[in-house]
């Protein structure tokens, strides 16, 4: 509180309101004006509009979901599975295998002052917006699958129904595509207007967007999760990695994204800076184009998978700051995870035997990677090329400009990724099973043999049965080899040491008050 206020109150005991207002203004000014450098600010900020990773980083603190994952608690209990906690919903219960009833948090405000009600939830998941024939954003169905129209029980109670039995419904409601939007604002602005001037319930309130330059937000002090610890946040677009690091070193930026391992030493040599790592629930992998004659025999694909020394790649190219992965499961899957599973174990000798059994005669195996797209992408591809050549695979590496070139005829394998969008086997569907699975475009046009029937069996609510089914799915993966897992996809941020913030296992930057604080006052 300003000194003049203390003196005035001591002498007169009046003008309390004016003094408290002045104190509030002073406190607001002492909060930091946070500046974050990102490689891109993207072009849209609608959570259901298939956001890019760069857009996810920004809108993660604009919107909230009904349920959220407690990543901090999960970190304290690795292998314990996903931990779900209240967010915009204070509680929920299963009515039946298809239906959840949720109680909404009362008094929650959107940035425009509207109160969150059941009508906003119903609109968010409506046929008009996502699930109808002429929906605005049908692409969100790849994550949310199929939901019936929301039943509004009362102003603060809703029932959300899946179109079929769904043991993952709670997890889907914690997914970023399930973030709740303001019905009135959305319809007033239209989808095109809303995605450029978003209105949510989170701690970031939109102020200004200059395309290709920056997006500015101010603190939403009415945020239901507590008063934000910042005064404002600006996301600056800085495409060049070296420029982001230079800006952090100079003090221009507080946090930077997309830090590569070769920049660690520059940052860590400065006592005022820190590298902040996070492992995404995503795997860097190689898609295998099984329609290419040279890899049509599954034994050759199996040889490709077991001839890669993942530990060596992680230790030499990632400084040990990620995990090697030789199978498509993660501990966050909880009860369906099998920690004893061996996956694609490194065995060059066995790989050579498989190639001999398949009658491989030295045909060219073309590996493609998009240049300057994945951190360390070309270097990892070169390592894989060398390992394949070591077991006798005649491997040619091609660096291309885009995905169209990557999947042009001739590719036997292409570097890519696949993530657990939510902590359940079903979230692999967009990659490996279902009519829209990427594998249907990338080597298995009729689907992976045996996969679809197993995927349908995941709908059971019996967790032991789900585990058995999922482990059979992994058996199919290891037999057919539609893709070859390499390692967990890491993401690296860097920040001033005065910034106390933890990156999460998804792309969203969580700037809520329980995850962001500062050791010093604002500049």
List the predicted regions and their residue ranges.
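Structural transition elements
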Residues: 323-357, 371-378
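Aromatic- and charge-enriched surface segment that lines or borders ligand/interaction sites
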Residues: 90-134, 159, 244-247, 294-296
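Ligand-site clamp/hinge motif
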Residues: 192, 220-266, 385, 394
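N-terminal lobe/hinge region of extracytoplasmic solute-binding protein
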Residues: 37-96, 126, 197-200
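Long beta-strand-rich cores associated with HINT superfamily self-processing modules
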Residues: 493-523
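Surface-exposed binding/hinge segments that line
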Residues: 29-30, 93, 103, 109, ...
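Gly/Pro-rich hinge or "lid" segments in bacterial periplasmic/extracellular proteins
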Residues: 70-75, 79, 83, 155, ...
């Amino acid at each position: 509180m300003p000194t003049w206020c203390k003196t005035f109150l001591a002498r007169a005991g009046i003008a309390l309101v004016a003094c408290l207002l002045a104190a509030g203004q002073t406190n607001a000014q002492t909060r930091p004006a946070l500046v974050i450098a990102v490689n891109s600010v993207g072009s849209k900020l609608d959570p259901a509009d298939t956001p890019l990773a760069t857009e996810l980083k920004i809108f993660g603190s604009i919107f909230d979901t009904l349920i959220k994952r407690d990543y901090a608690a999960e970190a304290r209990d690795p292998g314990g599975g996903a931990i779900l906690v209240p967010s915009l919903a204070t509680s929920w219960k299963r009515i039946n295998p298809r239906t959840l009833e949720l109680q909404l948090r009362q008094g929650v405000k959107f940035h425009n002052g509207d109160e969150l009600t059941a009508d906003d939830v119903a609109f968010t998941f409506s046929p008009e917006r996502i699930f109808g024939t002429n929906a605005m954003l049908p692409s969100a169905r790849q994550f949310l699958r199929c939901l019936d129209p929301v039943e509004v029980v009362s102003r603060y109670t809703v029932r959300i129904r899946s179109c079929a039995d769904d043991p993952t419904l709670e997890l889907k409601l914690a997914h970023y595509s399930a973030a709740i939007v303001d019905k009135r604002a959305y319809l007033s602005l239209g989808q095109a207007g809303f995605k450029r001037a978003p209105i949510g319930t989170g701690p970031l309130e939109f102020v200004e967007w200059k395309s290709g330059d920056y997006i500015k937000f101010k603190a939403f002090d009415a945020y239901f999760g507590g008063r934000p610890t910042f005064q404002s946040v600006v996301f600056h677009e800085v495409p060049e990695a070296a420029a982001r690091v230079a800006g952090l070193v100079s003090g221009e930026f507080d946090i930077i994204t997309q830090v590569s391992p070769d920049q660690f030493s520059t940052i860590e040599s400065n006592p005022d800076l820190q590298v902040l790592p996070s492992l995404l629930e995503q795997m860097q992998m190689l898609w295998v184009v099984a329609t290419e004659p040279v890899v049509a025999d599954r034994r050759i694909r199996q040889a490709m998978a077991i001839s890669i020394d993942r530990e060596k790649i992680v230790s030499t190219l990632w400084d040990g700051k990620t995990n090697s992965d030789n199978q498509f499961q993660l501990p966050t899957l909880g009860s369906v995870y099998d920690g004893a599973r061996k996956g694609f174990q490194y065995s060059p000798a066995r790989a050579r035997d498989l190639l001999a059994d398949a009658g491989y005669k030295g045909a060219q195996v073309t590996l493609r990677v998009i240049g300057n797209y994945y951190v360390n992408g070309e270097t990892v591809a070169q390592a894989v090329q060398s390992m394949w050549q070591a077991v006798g695979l005649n491997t040619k590496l091609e660096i291309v400009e885009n995905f169209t070139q990557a999947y042009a005829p001739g590719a036997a394998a292409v570097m890519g990724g696949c993530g657990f969008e939510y902590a359940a086997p079903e979230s692999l569907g967009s990659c490996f099973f279902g009519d829209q699975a990427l594998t249907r475009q990338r080597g298995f046009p009729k689907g992976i043999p045996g996969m679809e029937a197993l995927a349908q069996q995941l709908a059971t609510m019996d967790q032991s049965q789900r585990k058995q089914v999922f482990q059979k799915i992994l058996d199919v993966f290891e037999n057919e080899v539609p893709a070859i897992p390499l390692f967990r996809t890491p993401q690296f941020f860097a920040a001033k040491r005065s910034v106390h913030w933890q990156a999460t296992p998804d792309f969203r930057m969580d700037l809520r008050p329980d995850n962001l604080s500062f050791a010093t006052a604002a500049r």
